[in-house]
From Swiss-Prot:
It comes from Homo sapiens (Human). GO terms for biological process: collagen biosynthetic process; ERAD pathway; lung epithelium development; phospholipid homeostasis; positive regulation of peptidase activity; protein secretion; protein transport; regulation of phosphatidylinositol 3-kinase/protein kinase B signal transduction. This is Reticulocalbin-3. It comes from the Eukaryota. Glycans are attached at residue 140. Degraded by PCSK6 and other endoproteases including FURIN and PCSK5. N-glycosylated. The lineage of its organism: Eukaryota, Metazoa, Chordata, Craniata, Vertebrata. Widely expressed. Ca(2+) 2 binds at residues 126, 128, 130, 132, 137. It is found in: Endoplasmic reticulum lumen. InterPro entries: EF-hand-dom_pair, EF_Hand_1_Ca_BS, EF_hand_dom. Residues 1-20 form the signal peptide. Gene3D superfamilies: EF-hand.
Length: 328
């Protein structure tokens, strides 16, 4: 799920130095703008043939799942038991795992990449270690220290950098819900991953419009849409896939058929309604493991179907937790 991310996030991903300035041309383009929920796993959902890799990756997260092919069945079951205890403690602690608790666990594992990126940002940008990230801290670490009125005097294309700075500040102000110019961890998460927060939806749409609306009429025309995907060489025939994109624009992007995209249509495109994948998988695991059909799972029921949840060397899909269980 993506559009052009903030300069700060690009900086983190590229591992620039604290004073290194970002490229004005940085950022993904084209179809990468669309913020769609990533699948819980790229593996086929093929339980009928004993392939539980999809379920393992959905339950544990893909990165952790890869680490556990070497576990014995006994190790897998023991560690799964600890996960079951933790799922219940995170909920109502009644000794059972409800559908809501199972869904919350799966959603938690799937958000690990977001938590990791925020932790990296936090460690880098909370320079005074006061437990908050101020706009001044973030700005200076990202763009460098400048005296007032001298911003970017030492770089080419200073105007582009000024626009980037203004854009990041605007996003920060929207993420900073209490308006104190100091980001809590939740507010920094909204800054880095605005697609995850309903109150940030308008800023994602505004940034996308600014990127694509070259004639500044407030809309995305079909040629502006195509220009973000494809740049033709002189004399080059337009590829078939570009023609397909034009048709996609007319048939599926331009909802009211007026020939261009307004803000609402841009939002529908880059932030489409998403299926609750963790809930779908939680329902599946509950259905397959709830032997007494009481609508909840006991620890015994989960361990009785342990190879669907985690596996081991014995199944060739072992995937639980070489991380300490408190990290999951």
């Amino acid at each position: 799920m993506m559009w052009r991310p903030s300069v700060l996030l690009l900086l983190l991903l590229l591992r620039h130095g604290a004073q290194g300035k970002p490229s004005p041309d940085a950022g993904p383009h084209g179809q990468g703008r669309v913020h769609q929920a990533a699948p819980l796993s790229d593996a086929p959902h093929d339980d009928a043939h004993g392939n539980f890799q999809y379920d393992h990756e959905a339950f544990l997260g893909r990165e952790v799942a890869k680490e556990f092919d070497q576990l014995t069945p006994e190790e897998s079951q023991a560690r799964l038991g600890r996960i079951v205890d933790r799922m219940d403690r995170a909920g109502d602690g009644d000794g059972w795992v409800s559908l809501a608790e199972l869904r919350a666990w799966i959603a938690h594992t799937q958000q690990r990449h977001i938590r990791d990126s925020v932790s990296a940002a936090w460690d880098t940008y909370d320079t005074d270690r006061d437990g908050r990230v101020g706009w001044e801290e973030l700005r200076n670490a990202t763009y460098g220290h400048y005296a007032p009125g001298e911003e970017f005097h030492d770089v080419e294309d200073a105007e582009t950098y000024k626009k980037m700075l203004a854009r990041d500040e605007r996003r920060f102000r929207v993420a900073d819900q209490d308006g104190d110019s100091m980001a809590t961890r939740e507010e920094l998460t909204a800054f880095l991953h605005p697609e995850e927060f309903p109150h940030m939806r308008d800023i994602v749409i505004a940034e996308t419009l600014e990127d694509l609306d070259r004639n500044k009429d407030g809309y995305v025309q079909v040629e502006e849409y195509i220009a973000d995907l494809y740049s033709a060489e002189p004399g080059e025939e337009e590829p078939a896939w570009v023609q397909t994109e034009r048709q996609q624009f007319r048939d599926f992007r331009d909802l009211n058929k007026d020939g261009h995209l307004d803000g609402s249509e841009v939002g529908h495109w880059v932030l489409p309604p998403a299926q609750d994948q963790p809930l779908v998988e939680a329902n599946h695991l509950l259905h397959e493991s709830d032997t007494d059909k009481d609508g909840r799972l006991s620890k015994a029921e989960i361990l009785g179907n342990w190879n669907m949840f985690v596996g081991s060397q014995a199944t060739n899909y072992g995937e639980d937790l070489t991380r300490h269980h408190d990290e999951l």
